[in-house]
Amino acid sequence: MAEKTLRKSNEDKQVKTENIYKIIPNSKFLEAGVYFGHRTQQWNPKMKKFIHSKRRGIHILDVSKTSKALEWAYKIINAAAAKGATFIFVGTKKHAKEIVKEQAQRTNSYYVTERWLGGTLTNSKTIFSRVRRLFDLEKMAENNFEGYTKKEGIEFKKELSKLQKNFEGIREMKTQPNFMIVVDPNVDRIAVKEARDKGVKIIGILDSDANPDFVDLGIPANDDSIKSISLILTVLADAIVNAKGGKDLFAYQDEANIILPEDKKIDSPQRSHFNNTRFDQSSSREHRDSWRRNSQNTSQNQEQSQRPYKRTYNKDSRETLDKKTKEEVK
C-alpha cells in the first residue's frame, strides 16, 4: 500500500513538473493562432505529417508537434550559443521585419529585413566591398561631403541611404554565421539556398505551404500572423540570451508572463475608401448622378464599339486604329 502511494505521489510530481516547465502553454499557441495553415489548395504534401485536420477549407497544424519542434530548437540553439555560435535572423515579410530586427538586436545577432542581396553568403568579397563603401560614405557625411559639389553630395546621400537600408543588420558581419533563423523559407528561398550551399544550419517556421526539406529543423506554425511569428522568434531568441546568462521572456515562463503583441490590421485601399464614404442624402445624390452619367457614357461606347470599323488601307489606317483603341481603353 505504501509503495502504491509513493508511486502515485511520484507520478503527480512528474505531471506537475512537466506542466510547470512546458516551453509554451498550449493556450498561448492557440491565442497566437499558431495552428492556422493556408488554404487546402495551397498546401505542400510534404507537410502532411504536421497537419492535424481541415476546417472550412483551411489546414490546421498540429500544435503538439509545434511544441516539440520548438523545444528541440530551443535546446539546439542554447547549446550552440553556449559554445559561441553566431546567428543570422532573416525575415523580409512586411509584418515580420520589426520582430526580426527586435529579436536579433536583443541577442546581438545579424539580421536581414530588407531584400536579401544575392551573394550575401556565397560572394562575401563583393558584400564586404559594399560595406566598406558604406563606412567611407558615413565618414564623408560627417564632414558634410566637404570638397564635393552640391549635386555630388546629393548623389552620395542617396547611395548612403540605400546602403544603410540594405546592410543595416550585417554591416558588422566579419565571418559566416553558424545558424540561420528564417521566418518564411518560401519568401526568402535565395537566403535559404545560399545557407544550404555554405553549410549554415537552418531553423525555420514551416507553414502548410512550406517544404520541410529546405531547412534542417522546421517548426510548424503560422508564418502570416504577427503574434505567431513573435511567439516563435522570442522563444528562439530566449535560447541565445539564456546561454549568455540572460533571462527568458517567453520560454518556460508562466502563462501570465507571456504577453503577445497585437496583430496589426491593414485595410486594403478599396476597404479604406469604402469606410470613409459618407452615405448622407447629398452624397447619395451625387453618387446617383455620377452613376447615371457613367452608365450613359458606357452605353454610348458600347454602341460605337458594335459598329464595324471601316477598313481603309491608306498609310494612316494603322495610326487611326491605334488611336481609336487607346480612346476606348481610356
UniProtKB/Swiss-Prot annotation:
Biased composition (Polar residues): 271-282
Region (Disordered): 263-330
Biased composition (Basic and acidic residues): 283-292, 313-330
Bias-annotated ranges (Low complexity): 293-307
Keywords linked to the UniProt accession: Ribonucleoprotein, Ribosomal protein
A single GO cellular-component term on record: small ribosomal subunit
Database matches in InterPro entries: Ribosomal_uS2 (IPR001865), Ribosomal_uS2_bac/mit/plastid (IPR005706), Ribosomal_uS2_flav_dom_sf (IPR023591)
Gene3D superfamilies for this protein: Glucose-6-phosphate isomerase like protein, domain 1, Helix hairpin bin
Molecular functions per Gene Ontology: structural constituent of ribosome
Gene Ontology biological-process entries: translation
Keyword field contains Ribonucleoprotein: yes
Family in the record: Belongs to the universal ribosomal protein uS2 family.
Protein name, UniProt field: Small ribosomal subunit protein uS2
Species name: Mycoplasmopsis pulmonis (strain UAB CTIP)
